[in-house]
């Protein structure tokens, strides 16, 4: 009897297990089918994104050199303080080379200079080169200036280990240079590239090297951990140095330095023979602005980086790559295939060129956002003279763009935001200096394309200044996510603007501002 019961229970147990297994198999099959379907959809989406990105890269490959790297080789920094600490740490640990290209180094940046000094003392094999703009770097001379501060490093370590160069635009010479005030003469062209190379890494940014950029002036900062990219920009840097004046310390000069044109430089010098200088500069720079004749690809990588330069004052014919790349991207976004894309465009100074403005309005995006500094976050806020009128001038240009958005019937798709964090020159007040573009493809959640660098996308950037940028094109989900996060956090202090906001009394622009804009354009400069 007991045996029968046991056998009955065993049979029942087997039947239950069999039924459960059948049930589980059914669920597994459903899950497997669902997973396969999801994977297939993901694959189709991935293939679609890849083919769309190929439209961009196919054109970019005709324009610029390309470097295929791992997405992990790109680090995105968030704050001025993080940028400063990262830069100092990398300089302290430098073994072979440090090259720093910037508009200027603050004349009181003794802590930063001490960081370079300690690195030179710690490593006798280290060589340091610094490139700034002549006009900005010597503005305060014979009082303490950027140039005199850097000359102290040469005095201490010698010209074999420390080099300081000052680029002078060929557009400002003779009588014009003699009569224009120092604060205004920078409108005729500057060395504006921000290249911070340390050994085999480079930080690309729009930030200069002074206290506000280290504390309360918001910008963007990407670290590229790539020897080929760092070497490329090193070659560009070296070439511009050979087109620039060399600083030497001097006890005889009240300024503490002299700027001379070495015989080893590209000849002639810009202040003596501007046209001859441009001709010689074009010869040495054109190869750097051209794509290689033979393309090498690395199929295993998912991220490409295109170095883009704008060297218009030095190139005849002008073979600069930044403006053609940017306008090419915007034209592509305006085609039916890319309807429904999303983009964010930002610049500290709201003064994009008419061509860029028109192309943005032709993109028909699912959403487009322009972010610019509010007048109270503009570095010129409170300045004296014409420069003090610039925040109001940029405000006027922002209003005109928003009017154009409305006229194009895109008010529901394109937004203009102004960034403000307190008021500049008051406790807790920040300025906004970030620039770039992020492009998110249709049906995607995060950007696949991003442009970062020194350019402000203005008439000045494309006709008078030297600019250097990198364009990132990626299929890597993690890098896309990080670019998306950067795009969002830069808008933490940004507020959407309306036409009514610009009509408020405090935002109205007087005749004197319009007159100042006209004068600056008339005499040959650019905002």
Model feature map: region roles:
Residues 233, 243-267:
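Non-catalytic, alpha-helical, charged scaffold/linker segments
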């Amino acid at each position: 009897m007991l045996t029968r019961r046991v056998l009955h229970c065993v049979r029942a147990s087997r039947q239950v297990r069999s039924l459960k297994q059948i049930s589980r198999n059914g669920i597994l099959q459903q899950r497997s089918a669902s997973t396969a379907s999801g994977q297939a959809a993901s694959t189709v989406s991935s293939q679609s994104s890849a083919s769309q990105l190929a439209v961009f890269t196919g054109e970019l490959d005709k324009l610029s050199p390309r470097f295929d790297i791992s997405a992990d080789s790109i680090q995105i920094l968030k704050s001025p303080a993080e940028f400063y600490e990262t830069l100092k740490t990398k300089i302290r640990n430098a073994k072979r080379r440090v090259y720093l290209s910037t508009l200027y180094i603050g004349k009181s940046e003794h802590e930063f200079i001490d960081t370079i000094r300690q690195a030179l003392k710690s490593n006798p094999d280290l060589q340091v080169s610094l490139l700034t703009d002549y006009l900005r770097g010597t503005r305060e001379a014979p009082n303490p200036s950027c140039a005199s501060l850097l000359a102290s490093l040469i005095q201490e370590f010698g010209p074999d280990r420390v080099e300081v160069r000052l680029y002078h635009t060929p557009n400002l010479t003779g009588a014009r240079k003699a009569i224009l005030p120092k604060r205004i003469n920078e409108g005729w062209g500057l060395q504006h590239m921000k290249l911070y190379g340390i050994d085999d890494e480079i930080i690309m940014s729009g930030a200069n090297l002074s206290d506000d950029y280290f504390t309360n002036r918001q910008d963007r900062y990407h670290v590229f951990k790539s020897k080929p990219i760092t070497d490329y920009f090193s070659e560009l840097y070296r070439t511009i140095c050979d087109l620039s004046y060399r600083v030497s310390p001097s006890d005889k000069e009240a300024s503490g330095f002299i700027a001379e044109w070495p015989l080893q430089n590209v000849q002639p010098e810009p202040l003596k023979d501007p046209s001859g200088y441009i001709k010689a500069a074009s010869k040495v720079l054109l190869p750097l602005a051209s794509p290689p004749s033979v393309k090498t690809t690395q199929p295993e990588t998912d991220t490409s980086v295109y170095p883009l330069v704008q060297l218009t004052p030095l190139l005849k014919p002008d073979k600069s790559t930044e403006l053609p790349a940017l306008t090419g991207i915007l034209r592509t976004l305006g085609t039916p295939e890319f309807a429904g894309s999303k983009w964010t465009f930002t610049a500290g100074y709201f003064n994009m060129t008419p061509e860029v403005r028109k192309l943005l309005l032709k993109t028909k995006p699912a959403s487009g956002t322009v972010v610019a500094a509010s007048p109270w976050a503009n570095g010129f806020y409170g300045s004296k003279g014409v420069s003090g009128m610039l925040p109001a001038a940029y405000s006027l240009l922002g209003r005109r763009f928003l009017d154009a958005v409305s006229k194009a019937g895109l008010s529901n798709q394109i937004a203009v935001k102004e960034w403000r964090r307190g008021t500049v020159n008051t406790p807790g007040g920040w300025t906004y200096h970030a620039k770039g573009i992020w492009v998110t493809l249709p049906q995607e959640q995060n950007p696949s394309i991003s442009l970062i660098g020194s350019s402000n996308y203005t008439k000045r950037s494309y006709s008078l200044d030297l600019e250097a940028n990198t364009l990132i094109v990626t299929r890597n989900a993690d890098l896309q996510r990080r670019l998306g996060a950067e795009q969002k956090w830069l808008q933490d202090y940004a507020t959407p603007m309306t036409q009514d906001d610009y009509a408020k009394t405090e935002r109205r622009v007087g005749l004197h501002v319009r007159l100042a804009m006209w004068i600056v354009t008339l005499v040959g400069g650019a905002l």
